[in-house]
Swiss-Prot record:
The keyword Endoplasmic reticulum applies. Keywords: Endoplasmic reticulum, Membrane, Transmembrane, Transmembrane helix. One of its GO terms (biological process) is mitotic spindle organization. This is Uncharacterized protein C4D7.07c. The keyword Transmembrane helix applies. It comes from Schizosaccharomyces pombe (strain 972 / ATCC 24843) (Fission yeast).
Amino acid sequence: MMSRKRQASSNDFFDMEQLLIANDALVHQNHSTPNHASDELSVNDPSPLSRGLQSDVNSNISRNISNTFFKKSIFFFVYYCKQALEFISTVFSIIKFLLNRRKVSFLLSFLLLFSLFLLIPNDGRVNIKFFYKDFVDRIPFRFIPSNFNISFGKHLEQAKSLFKSKFGNSSSTYNERDSIMPLLKLQSNLTEAKTLLYQNPISPEDVLLHFWDRNLMSTYDLKIQDINDSVNPLLNTYLDFIEKDIYLVSHLPVSEKHPGNIPISLVNKSVQAICSFAEHYNLLRNPSYRGFLRINNGESIFNLLCIEDLHESVNLDILCLKDILRNIAQSSKEAMYIVKRHNSSQSFYGNRSTTNFSIINSGLYLKKDAAKNLLAKQFDATYSYYHKDLEESVHQKLNSNLEKRVEKYIKHSCSQRNVADHPDFALKVVGAVVDYGWTFPKPKFSDILRDYWGKKANLPTALLDTSINSNWCNYEDTVQVSVRLNRPMYVRHISLIFPIHGDDSYFPREIQMFGLINDINYQILSNMNNLVLLATIPVSLSSVFEVNYYYLPKFSDTPGLLEEAYFNTFVFRAFSKNESLTSQICLYHIGIHGKEINEEF
């Protein structure tokens, strides 16, 4: 029955083909056979009759062609639909047979069809997805925004907030009062001096004698180290701040003697001097002193510290240097004795609010020769300084110093601190995958099967795990692995995990870090290769390395561009220590730390 149907359909197809051949021959004959009668009629007698005959012939030809094409298209549509139905019927019969008679055969056939897909690991499926994504990204005339933000800049206020968030909450170190008692006592003395000056203005010399002759600091055993000529400028600076501020406060009018109208408070200037002196001895690394200065003197003084060295702690005490202060006080006493001797007509301890200023001025300007080697030159030099744009000059100097230190902190100090504060994006749990297109040597098929069934395998995906047991070893002198992150980011640091025990000959000599770019996407880097060298990392026991963006030969003309560039794929190339046929390289987790492109620094 089926054979007769097929024969009938083939006969119909043969008849249709014969009809088409006959129709084509008729059309060809009408076009090619010369019709002399019509030619003569059309040439010699161009009458409406000849034009009518020609139009009838053309209409018949077009009608025959359209009918033939319509019949032919209907025939092929019905024919292919019939073939599709027969194929579906045959497949259904085979499946029905397998289900009824051979269930095991059906299961094996199903597994055979889908085994290749099941054997592909997760990274392989992700690579397939990214392959099509990259193919679409490379389509011309596709708008892709550039990854460079030229307008990005580091502002001082953002740096201050960053500094405050990093070091502003370490309150656990402020209870170590034993190590900061000298500084507390000095603070108490200066505060008492300031209060006394507010209430009863007296001479600077009397203030020094009153506090330092009482020997309030003698009960503390202070640690003094390496007092030599190099320290003397710092000591003089410290003493100058104290005397200048006392002199300034004592000569303000009584109505202005409150903290709001004092250009620079006695405490703040003294603490600035303490900071400059302590910086020479690395005292600012002690968290106790940092906490004390931040609590008692405000954020502005605390920000003056050497913040790039805050990662260490040194147990040293502040040097109060009472003997040198006593000598200065004695010199001040001698100077005042000279002043009083030349002004014996006035009572020094009388109405101090009215007589003290004239006595000091007479001592400065009338008896400058007598007090030349003591305090006269110092008072005369600082008088105009404090009365001419004092606030503006000090604030400019303060902001300039703070901006430089915070800028230095942002660039260099993070590498000396724990990278745990920065998230690690090169982890499998956060979406990082290995791009096998830029990875060599390629993994073996047996390792892929072992990894799929949960067995120990030598795959580069081990680098996406922080476990010390996860490593990727190869008998090569050079290996390369590419890590694709789940989002673009600004890279700031990388961390290398290597065991500190065992044979270190398996460790690489150095690791080169590249950023993978697309020439179509990034117009600024269009004249370079796809791989941009970010850093060359020497492998050592140090687990932290800061990527130096400013030491790149390719960006020597515009070094600031690369710092603003973000990357989504990073390539690591490791070189063996032993360049031989038996050399082996073992890589462990390589952490990529930084900021996402939508985060603010």
